[in-house]
Amino acid sequence: MMKQDWVKAAAALALAALGIGAAHADATLDRVKQRGKIVVGVDGASPPFGLLDPATGKVGGFQTELGADIARRLGVTLETVPVTASTRVQFLQAGKVDLLIANIQWTQERSEILSYAPTPYNLVGGAAMVSKKSGIKRWEDLKGKVACVSQGSNFAKPLQDTYGAVVKGLRNIPESLLALKGGSCDASVHIQPALYETLNGPNGREWSDFELATPDQLIPSPTVIWTRRNEADTRAFVDGVIRDWHQSGLLVKQAERYGVPADYLKQASIQAQAGKFESAPPEALATP
């Protein structure tokens, strides 16, 4: 599913993306090269994007693989830091992480406080997980119902403004799902792949009384890699890497390996091989 109505960013954004000299590198690239390590914020144990290894306590999976490829290209090691909806922006702004490779879709508000590589590495929208007995079959059926989301979710506004839901913000997806199971939410609204994994993954049997209300995703949006403001070299370098991921098929390969839905990525790869790339809207002016 390709989102054709995005504003196309200028092709010059990716020029020199794969060859940045240390003398011209911005603060992030300088710091990464000096310490020999890049620190990437990822979603943590959030299947199918992040998987926790109980033996080591470390997070692996789709997002970690992408971070590892960036580290390899820079000739440094990778450190991942689990982030949540309530900590990820602060971690990036405070320098606790160098990049965010998490399920953070482009929004106007986010683009006013952070920078990002304009080429998306995925396209993701929201889904509503509900009880099979709820009678909720469309987004419109959420009017007057309690919809649980993660704090800071970009799904909150359309749920409230477009569909009239009563939005309840919780710390993360597990808390939201527990609230749904406990009856304090009528729907748990999060990115579609994560809820699909919940229903169909290894622990799916405990959710046999629940389902996705509709196959229609809520505001499918470009998922981008986020950087700090005014770090043009980092932004350009990462954008060039993402374009190479699309052209080489790496994103499709890793998505299929970890069970991430790959329909959009397959189409994007075909387009990339023809030299065509999707782009998130141009970066907004920084807020005062």
What kind of region is each of these model predictions?
Residues 122-130, 202-242, 261-285:
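Periplasmic-binding protein-like
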Residues 50-54, 67-76, 152-172, 199-206:
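Ligand-binding cleft/hinge of the Venus flytrap
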